[in-house]
């Protein structure tokens, strides 16, 4: 069994034979269901890009737990320099295996910076853990290559998709992404954290219809697969 817990915004905690955090923005997150100190055991932290609402508490958690941090090559170097002693794994799109976890770093259409300087490119991740395939889109607009992700790495058991608009896909675009990805389940994310990304997940669910099972999670709630 693999348990996927929504922590708020774009942060998720995945538990199986390994424990994985994705985009651990907890401190300063107005909708977060957890604090950095709540995580006692983390094997891997995946970061989609350098914006603060995704990089979040990566340094604090990685230092305390010894988790390895997976990120775009440039961002991995930035993290290693900023948080001395943290083990990073830099990638530049493509597949790898870390501690028996299969990871594919895939493109995302978004920027990546620390607010001043550009730090590599944005990405998403396809993770296969204990036979379950999870796609975290990161921050992105919909794009046709999502269809290729499904062809190469599917079937996707659960897709974690932004629906808030303004900086990412909105509900209409995310529903189109579901058509391309063909996942069994979809969890909407990156919405209602702040007014610019206000969105109605029920509207998204209606647009998706029978194409996938939309699971609307409140921060702290989980889907078991």
From Swiss-Prot:
One of its GO terms (molecular function) is hydrolase activity. InterPro entries: Metallo-B-lactamas, RibonucZ/Hydroxyglut_hydro, UPF0173, UPF0173_UPF0282_UlaG_hydrolase. Pfam families: Lactamase_B_3 (PF13483). Keywords: Hydrolase. It comes from the Archaea. Belongs to the UPF0173 family. NCBIfam families: PRK00685.1. This is UPF0173 metal-dependent hydrolase PF1764. It comes from Pyrococcus furiosus (strain ATCC 43587 / DSM 3638 / JCM 8422 / Vc1). The lineage of its organism: Archaea, Methanobacteriati, Methanobacteriota, Thermococci, Thermococcales.
């Amino acid at each position: 069994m693999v348990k996927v817990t929504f922590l708020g915004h774009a942060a998720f905690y995945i538990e199986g034979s390994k424990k994985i955090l994705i985009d651990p923005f907890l401190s300063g997150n107005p909708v977060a269901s957890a604090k950095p100190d709540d995580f006692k055991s983390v094997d891997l932290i995946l970061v989609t890009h350098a914006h603060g609402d995704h990089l979040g508490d990566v340094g604090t958690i990685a230092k305390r737990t010894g988790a390895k941090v997976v990120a775009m090559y440039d961002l991995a170097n930035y993290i290693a320099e900023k948080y001395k002693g943290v083990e990073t794994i830099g990638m530049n799109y493509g597949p790898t295996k870390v501690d028996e976890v299969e990871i594919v770093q895939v493109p995302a259409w978004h920027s990546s910076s620390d607010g001043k300087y550009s730090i590599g490119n944005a990405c998403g991740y396809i993770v296969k853990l204990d036979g379950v395939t999870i796609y975290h889109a990161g921050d992105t607009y919909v794009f046709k290559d999502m269809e290729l992700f499904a062809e190469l790495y599917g079937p996707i058991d659960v897709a974690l998709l932004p629906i808030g608009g303004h900086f990412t896909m909105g509900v209409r675009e995310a529903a189109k992404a579901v058509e391309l990805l063909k996942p069994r389940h979809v969890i909407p994310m990156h919405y209602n954290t702040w007014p610019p990304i206000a969105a109605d997940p029920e509207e998204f669910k209606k647009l998706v219809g029978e194409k996938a099972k939309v699971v609307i999670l409140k921060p702290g709630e989980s889907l078991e697969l």
